[in-house]
Curated annotation (Swiss-Prot):
InterPro entries: RNA_pol_su_RPB10, RNA_pol_suN_Zn-BS, RPABC5/Rpb10. It comes from the Archaea. It comes from Sulfurisphaera tokodaii (strain DSM 16993 / JCM 10545 / NBRC 100140 / 7). PANTHER family: DNA-DIRECTED RNA POLYMERASES I, II, AND III SUBUNIT RPABC5, DNA-DIRECTED RNA POLYMERASES I, II, AND III SUBUNIT RPABC5 FAMILY MEMBER. This is DNA-directed RNA polymerase subunit Rpo10. GO terms for molecular function: DNA binding; DNA-directed RNA polymerase activity; zinc ion binding. The gene is rpo10. GO terms for biological process: DNA-templated transcription. It catalyses: RNA(n) + a ribonucleoside 5'-triphosphate = RNA(n+1) + diphosphate. NCBIfam families: PRK04016.1 (NF003089). It is found in: Cytoplasm. Belongs to the archaeal Rpo10/eukaryotic RPB10 RNA polymerase subunit family. Zn(2+) binds at C7, C10, C44, C45.
Amino acid sequence: MIIPIRCFTCGSLIGDKWEPFITRVSNGEDPGKVLDDLGVKRYCCRRMLLSHVDIIKEVIHYTRPI
């Protein structure tokens, strides 16, 4: 869905790191190196970015009108 603003486990701010992360990984950089450069050290925060699946464009087709 939408990338969370904070880590579910420790509460660290991770939402601001999503765009630089996805841009650099799309350009072929190693995800682990990118996370190190962005300062994401905790494994709980790293998994939030590494395991996120952006499916908002698929889900939005199934919303009901208000």
